[in-house]
Amino acid sequence: MTEVKAELVGSVWKITAKSGDEVAEDDVLMILESMKMEISVTAPRAGKVLEIRVKETDVVKEGQVLVVLE
């Protein structure tokens, strides 16, 4: 399992992946908004999305787990 974590404090603007999706390395999983900038959260490797631990509009902290890949 691989945990994809937030690299900064921000809010979840849009989630583009869902549980069960097969993703490739560097696929965009979600977009965070921080200080009026959009930051793409990408898959660090290919795999299957097991769990998305946030929802749109959630405020996330640096280091918070956003997505779990199989």
Question: Model regions: which residues?
Answer:
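Short beta-strand-turn/beta-hairpin segments enriched in glycine/proline and small hydrophobics
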Residues: 1-11, 28-44
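Short histidine-centered loop motifs in beta-beta connectors
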Residues: 8, 14-18, 22, 51-54
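Surface-exposed, flexible loop/turn segments at secondary-structure boundaries
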Residues: 20, 37, 57
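PDZ-domain C-terminal substructure recognizer with occasional recognition of PDZ-binding tails
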Residues: 47, 52, 58-66
